[in-house]
């Protein structure tokens, strides 16, 4: 069964690897597919896809979009050809992704707000208006027992409107954190999402991030990326 890690970042946002390094890590991890989902930009997406094609790796172009304050939650869009504008409402972000023919995935839900995670009431209001195409139910962020129970309960109660169940590593460090969490799927990836033929599970990858690289990434995420947003660079 094909294996995907469908939530990956590069130096184009707050990741720590080039497109070439990301593709190399995915190939060495024996993945069949990745999704390139940099924050609020698709600057590296085409290069990742081209390098993936050359290496026999399927690449879904996408973006992890930051919605408007005060929520400032993250929404994943897959199968995109052009960037999604940041700082729109959650509903407008979802609509913009769907207008492109993209798929909407909810990443790392119900985590603390500093993860930019959607919260239960917000997600309920969203799916009351429009179902989403998938939701990450297995991820590397430390959910804790209480949040895990909350997510499991929410998914059980609302599964018809939440789409496919997804697992991903939210990879920022290439070979150091890719394929920790993966999605098994049948046949064509997009079709598998639409038909909910996916299985999230723990993958073969192991976390091995050097401490210096970790702190450099935190600076990129918490300082450099917000400054670029303020300057209008992304």
What are these regions (language model features)?
Residues 39, 109, 140:
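Flexible loop residues that form catalytic
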Residues 60:
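General small-molecule cofactor/ligand-binding pocket signal
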Residues 6, 37, 63, 107, ...:
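Active-site flanking residues adjacent to catalytic metal/cofactor-binding acidic residues
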Residues 36, 82-86:
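Catalytic cores of extracellular degradative/oxidative enzymes
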Residues 1-6, 10, 16-24, 29, ...:
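Charged catalytic cores and adjacent phosphate/nucleic-acid-binding surfaces used
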Residues 87-92:
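Ordered, amphipathic secondary-structure segments that act as subunit-interaction surfaces
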Residues 100-110, 161-164:
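Short beta-strand/loop segments at the ligand-binding rim of alpha/beta enzyme cores
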Residues 23-43, 102-105:
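Divalent metal-dependent hydrolysis catalytic cores, especially in the metallo-beta-lactamase
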């Amino acid at each position: 069964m094909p294996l995907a890690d469908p939530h990956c970042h590069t130096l184009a946002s707050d990741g720590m690897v080039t497109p070439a390094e990301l593709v190399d890590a995915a190939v060495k991890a024996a993945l069949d597919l990745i999704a390139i989902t940099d924050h609020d930009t698709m600057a590296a997406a085409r290069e990742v896809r081209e390098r993936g094609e050359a290496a026999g790796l399927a690449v879904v172009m996408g973006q992890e979009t930051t919605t408007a304050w005060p929520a400032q939650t993250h929404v994943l869009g897959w199968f995109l050809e052009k960037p999604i504008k940041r700082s729109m409402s959650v509903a407008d972000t979802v609509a913009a992704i769907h207008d492109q023919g993209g798929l909407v995935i909810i990443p790392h839900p119900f985590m603390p707000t500093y993860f930019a995670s959607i919260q239960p009431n917000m997600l309920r209001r969203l799916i009351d208006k429009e179902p989403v195409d998938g939701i990450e139910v297995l991820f590397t962020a430390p959910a804790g027992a209480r949040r895990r129970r909350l997510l499991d309960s929410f998914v059980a109660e609302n599964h018809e409107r939440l789409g496919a169940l997804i697992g991903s590593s939210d990879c920022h460090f290439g070979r150091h954190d890719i394929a920790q969490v993966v999605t098994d799927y049948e046949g064509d990836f997009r079709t598998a999402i639409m038909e909910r033929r996916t299985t999230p599970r723990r993958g073969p990858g192991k976390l091995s991030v050097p401490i210096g690289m970790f702190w450099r990434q935190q600076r990129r995420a918490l300082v450099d990326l917000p400054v670029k947003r303020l300057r209008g660079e992304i």
